[in-house]
C-alpha cells in the first residue's frame, strides 16, 4: 500500500523526489515562482541542523549577529569579481514607499559586502582580531530552474564571516570550519559520506581566492554540493577599507573568510537516504527518533504508551506519542514511514495482554515483538545501529559508482551513472570546458591521499568529476 504512494526511484528519480517532499509534508511551492513554503516537518529538520551547526560554530569561536536584508547597490560594485559573479541572480528594489529610490537596493544574495562595511567600522587594531561572525538568515538569488530545497529563489542558510591578521590565520580558520564544523555534522549527524576538496578557479566563489567544498553523492549518482568555505584574501578588505593598526604600528589590511550551508541539506538527506517508502532520517538528526503509536483503545494501552514514552524521553530519545485512534492505524503507520521516523513502536490491546509491543525499524524494515521492559534498550541500540547503517549504505554506493578513468572522454561516459576520478593534469582548463559542454563539472580537486590541496597547481592532484544538482 505504501509503495503505491510514491513513484519508484528506479522509474523516475526526480518525480520520486517531488513525491517524497509532498507526501512527507516537507515543503511546497510558494506563490511566487521559485519560492518555497517549508512545512513544520521540513522545518523541524532544519531546526535540528541549525542546532548541530550552531553549537559547533560557537565552539569555533564565532558569535551570531544579524545584518540587513537590503544592501545598497553601490556596495555590490565595490568588488568587481563579486558583482560580476552574482549579477545574473540579483533581485533589486527600485521603489520604496511609492517613490523611486535614489539608489537601488539589492535583496541580500550573500552578505560579504554589508558585513565588510561593518567590519571596517568595528576593527581598529590587532587587538580586535580575529573577528568571527555568523548569521542565520534568508537570501534571494533569482533562480531560473527552481527545485524544492535544491534551488529556490529564496532559501535559508547560515553564513559565516571572519577577519584575521594574516593569510595563514584566515586559511587555518576556513579549514577549521570545513572540517570541524561542516564535515563533522555531515558525516556524524547526517550520515553523509562526503568528498572534501578544493574548487577549481572556474568553480570557486565570486571574489574568493580559494573555495573548499564538501560533495555528496545522491541516490541517482549525481553530486550535491553540501557546503563551502572560502578564503577571500584581501579582496573585500581592500574594497571596503577593512584595516587595522598592527602591533608594529602600521595600518594593514585584514584577511577575510566566508562560509555557508543552506536548506539544500534537506534535499540531500532525501536523495541520499530515501527509499521507495519515503524519507529515512538519520537517527542522530531526526526530530522524532521514535513514534509510539496506539493501535486502538483497550485496557492498559494508554498507560503503557505513556509509560514507555516517558521512559524513552528519560533515556534521551526524542519521542512522539500518537494516540489518534480516530485516525485509521494504517494511515498513521504509513505517515510515520513516509516521514522517516527511525523507530515505530506499536501498542494495542493484544500486545498488552502478551506483555509486549511491536518494534519497527525504518532503515532495516525489521518488525519484531519485544518485551515491554526491554523497549528502551532495544530502541537506543537500534538508533545507533541504523545511524551507522545509513552511512555505510551511502558510502558503499559512492564507492561503487565512482570510476577511476584516464581521459576526459572516459569521464564523460562514467558521469552517466556516477562520478569519475582522473588526474587533474589530464583535465586542465580545456578539459574542464569540454566537460561543461556535456553538463558535467569538476566537483573538486583532492590530493592522491584524499587530502585537501592548498593550490590547484600542486602536482599529482585528482579531479572528481560528475553531474550535479
Language model features: what each stretch is:
Residues 1-469:
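NTP/phosphate- and nucleic-acid-binding module
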Amino acid at each position: 500500500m505504501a509503495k503505491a504512494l510514491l513513484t519508484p526511484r528506479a522509474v523516475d528519480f526526480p518525480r520520486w523526489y517531488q513525491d517524497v517532499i509532498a507526501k512527507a509534508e516537507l515543503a511546497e511551492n510558494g506563490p511566487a515562482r521559485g519560492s518555497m513554503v517549508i512545512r513544520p516537518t521540513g522545518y523541524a529538520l532544519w531546526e535540528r541542523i541549525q542546532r548541530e551547526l550552531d553549537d559547533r560554530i560557537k565552539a569555533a569561536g564565532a558569535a551570531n549577529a544579524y545584518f540587513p536584508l537590503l544592501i545598497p547597490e553601490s556596495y555590490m560594485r565595490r568588488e568587481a569579481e563579486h558583482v560580476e559573479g552574482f549579477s545574473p541572480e540579483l533581485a533589486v528594489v527600485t521603489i520604496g514607499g511609492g517613490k523611486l529610490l535614489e539608489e537601488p537596493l539589492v535583496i541580500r544574495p550573500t552578505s560579504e559586502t554589508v558585513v565588510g562595511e561593518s567590519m571596517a567600522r568595528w576593527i581598529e587594531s590587532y587587538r580586535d582580531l580575529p573577528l568571527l561572525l555568523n548569521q542565520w538568515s534568508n537570501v534571494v538569488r533569482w533562480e531560473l530552474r527552481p527545485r524544492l530545497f535544491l534551488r529556490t529563489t529564496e532559501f535559508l542558510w547560515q553564513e559565516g564571516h571572519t577577519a584575521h591578521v594574516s593569510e595563514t590565520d584566515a586559511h587555518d580558520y576556513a579549514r577549521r570550519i570545513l572540517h570541524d564544523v561542516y564535515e563533522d555534522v555531515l558525516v556524524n549527524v547526517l550520515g553523509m559520506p562526503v568528498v572534501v576538496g578544493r574548487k577549481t578557479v572556474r568553480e570557486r566563489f565570486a571574489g574568493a581566492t580559494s573555495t573548499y567544498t564538501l560533495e555528496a553523492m545522491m541516490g541517482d549518482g549525481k553530486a550535491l554540493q553540501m557546503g563551502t568555505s572560502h578564503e577571500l584574501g584581501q579582496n573585500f578588505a581592500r574594497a571596503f577599507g577593512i584595516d587595522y593598526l598592527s602591533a608594529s604600528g602600521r595600518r594593514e589590511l585584514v584577511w577575510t573568510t566566508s562560509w555557508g550551508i543552506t536548506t539544500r541539506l534537506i534535499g540531500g538527506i532525501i536523495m541520499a537516504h530515501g527509499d521507495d517508502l519515503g524519507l529515512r532520517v538519520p537517527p542522530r538528526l531526526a526530530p522524532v527518533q521514535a513514534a509510539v503509536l496506539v493501535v486502538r483503545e483497550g485496557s492498559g494501552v494508554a498507560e503503557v504508551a505513556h509509560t514507555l514514552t516517558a521512559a524513552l524521553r528519560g533515556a534521551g530519545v526524542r519521542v512522539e506519542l500518537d494516540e489518534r485512534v480516530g485516525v485509521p492505524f494504517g494511515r498513521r503507520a504509513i505517515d510515520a514511514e513516509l516521514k522517516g521516523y527511525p523507530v515505530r513502536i506499536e501498542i494495542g490491546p493484544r500486545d498488552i495482554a502478551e506483555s509486549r509491543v511491536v518494534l519497527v525499524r525504518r532503515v532495516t524494515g525489521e518488525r519484531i515483538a519485544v518485551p515491554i521492559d526491554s523497549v528502551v534498550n532495544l530502541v537506543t541500540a537500534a538508533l545507533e545501529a541504523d545511524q551507522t547503517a545509513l552511512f555505510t549504505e551511502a558510502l558503499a554506493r559512492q564507492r561503487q559508482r565512482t570510476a577511476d578513468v584516464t581521459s576526459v572522454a572516459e569521464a564523460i561516459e562514467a558521469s552517466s551513472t556516477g562520478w569519475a576520478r582522473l588526474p587533474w593534469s589530464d583535465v586542465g582548463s580545456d578539459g574542464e570546458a569540454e566537460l561543461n559542454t556535456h553538463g558535467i563539472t569538476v566537483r573538486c580537486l583532492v590530493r592522491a591521499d584524499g587530502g585537501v590541496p592548498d593550490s590547484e597547481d600542486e602536482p599529482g592532484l585528482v579531479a572528481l568529476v560528475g553531474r550535479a544538482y
